[in-house]
Amino acid sequence: MQKIIVTGGLGFIGSNLIKILLQKKYKVINIDKISYASNFYNVKNFKKNKNYSFIKCDINYKKKILNILKRNKPVGIFNIAAETHVDRSIDGPKAFINSNILGVFNLLEAFKNYSKSNNKIKLIHISTDEVFGDLKKGRSHENFAYNPTSPYAASKAASDHLVSSYIKTYDLRAIVTNCSNNYGPRQHPEKLIPKLIYNILKNRPLPIYGKGKNSREWIHVYDHCEALVKVFKKGKLGEFYNIGSNKNLNNLEITKLLLKIAKKIIKINSNVKIKLVKDRPGHDFRYALNSNKIKKRLNWNSKIKFEKGLYETFLWYYKNQSFYDSFDKKDIIRRLGLKND
């Protein structure tokens, strides 16, 4: 049975990817440093699976990563370990530089060293559409120039360039993916959709930045993870692949749709109302990806319709409210990203 390493596997995307990899009969080694966003709740359903194991390790620990590679001899690494919340990057960029740039550098060094004795291993580096920056119209394709605006986006852009440079300079077997906004079960409640659901369930107002017109492309985490597996199996080494759904909605549309869904499941308290709040500094207005490359070359398409996926997502958080209890309440309700005031 082949082994796969997933970095950041206690997080949202990582834990969902591990679930799919186990279903596809891989042995999975989850490497996570256990940050504020890490949650053992996310892996509780398969932590006793004989094909799953966990190692506490920061990807900055180059020697330890190399030892893990030598000991386990995996066929692939999915690098999902990252700081990802834009608002937090505004308040404290240093953590993003440390994890998303220095961490990727040290992971690449360990990978390069190990590749000398194993020239079959592949690295899939997971990135974001935010590296392309604000897009007034059209959709960003893989050859678009990077134009990051937040410290988070800049750190991810730097990591993408690092991976690309190691591919070209050291002939490393790696692929980079850039994905649009994810939603689904087990997402940290600092993010828009789980935070809105939390506020609905707790009878709280629904804070929306600015005028609520900022638009994002939304993809279910299951579709994203299936795309990652497809890239691992069939993707061309050295290439970049965009992963998106072509489904754009603004924040007000998301909120109104969630309220519509909630009314079918629970009784809505009168306190649950949309509340427009001060916008995030440098808030990009629109992101949108052109995903034709992965669709045409790898025969991948997103399958989950947004309205159905959002309904199932609300239902999951409603039925698993103990998930919220596994986080510090202050992390859920606290407003971040206003440090420039």
What are these regions (language model features)?
Residues 184, 188, 217-220:
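Active-site helix-initiating loop/hinge in glycosyltransferases
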Residues 4, 20, 38, 57, ...:
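C-terminal substrate-binding subdomain of Rossmann-fold SDR/epimerase-dehydratase oxidoreductases
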Residues 116, 124, 136-137, 171, ...:
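Proline-centered turn/helix-capping motifs that create local helix->coil transitions or kinks
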Residues 64, 95, 102, 131, ...:
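Residue-level recognition of oxygen-bearing side chains
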Residues 1-182, 232, 251, 285, ...:
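N-terminal Rossmann-like NAD(P)+-binding domain of SDR-like oxidoreductases, especially those catalyzing
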Residues 138, 189-197:
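A glycine/serine/threonine-rich, flexible loop-to-helix segment
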